[in-house]
Amino acid sequence: RKKNTDCKIIMATSKIERFKEAFKIAAFRFVSKPFFEEEIIDALFDALQTMIGLEPIEFYEKRISYEIPQREVCIVIAYDSFVEALVGKRRMRKDISLKRLMEILDSRLFYQIDRRYVVNLLHVSSYQNGEIIVGEEKFIVSRRRRKEFEKVYREFDVTYGGVK
């Protein structure tokens, strides 16, 4: 479990009393015998739905192209004709408009908080009174987008809250 934290565990057993073990190993789902095809398919589908941000996106650092999983991008900052992405402690760029980039990014994972900044909801450590903290930096959600952000962030937290 410690080696591959992204792995979703679906525990399948004939002994219902083993559900405590499922909690102990942080199983995503518990399925008991007799197995029903629909129940197995639902468990697998739900597990796949939580695996967000794995699609790669191309960014450049010192004119070298890198394929970065979207989940690793913390913040996107728009400039005139390009965007800059904060990936961990690295700053990478891409010659693309913010509008075009938003069409490429996973909409379940990214939210545009104002005309210049897009945040990855996985990396938001706290939100209070229109202020977001991502890593060590603070960002302000525009007043116009505040209510919608709160709704989107709440839904994200309920649906994907344990995902990292």
What spans do the regions from the language model cover?
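CheY-like receiver
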Residues: 1-54
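Small/polar loops that bind or transfer phosphate-bearing groups
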Residues: 11, 32, 86, 93, ...
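Conserved binding/recognition cores within well-folded domains
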Residues: 42-138
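C-terminal output/interaction extensions
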Residues: 149-164
